[in-house]
């Protein structure tokens, strides 16, 4: 039987692995846990009706968005969504969209 990194049910296979540093409480590696966390986040977003959009901006624009979001006491994501919805509403009222 081959030893899988994700298989932590058979502890005898991992009894002699020496790991540096503090003993960890999570049986999964950091990379595996990050993948699980990302998958869970995507599921939570889907339930909330959210879709992922990737956006690349220059540092100046990001800093301006951060400052504005902080002054309005909201997250940058919420601020961007609000700005987009306002712009779309304005375009709809003009009959463009």
UniProtKB/Swiss-Prot annotation:
Basic and acidic residues compositional bias, start-end: 1-20
Segments for region (Disordered): 1-30
CDD domains given in the database record: RHH_CopG_NikR-like
Family annotation (InterPro entries): CopG, Ribbon_hlx_hlx
Cysteine pairs bridged by disulfides in the record: none
Induction: Expressed at a low level, probably partially repressed by LexA, induced by DNA damage.
Pfam families, per the entry: RHH_1
Example GO BP: regulation of DNA-templated transcription
Name of the protein in its database record: Uncharacterized protein YbfE
Organism per entry: Escherichia coli (strain K12)
Lineage: Bacteria, Pseudomonadati, Pseudomonadota, Gammaproteobacteria, Enterobacterales
């Amino acid at each position: 039987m081959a030893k899988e990194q994700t298989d932590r049910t058979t502890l005898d296979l991992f009894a002699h692995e020496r790991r540096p540093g503090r003993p960890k409480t999570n049986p999964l590696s950091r990379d595996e846990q990050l993948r699980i966390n990302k998958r869970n986040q995507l599921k939570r977003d889907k339930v909330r009706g959210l879709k992922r959009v990737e956006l690349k901006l220059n540092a100046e624009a990001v800093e301006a968005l951060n400052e504005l979001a902080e002054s309005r006491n909201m997250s940058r994501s919420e601020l961007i969504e609000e700005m987009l919805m306002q712009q779309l509403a304005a375009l709809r009222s003009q009959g463009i969209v």
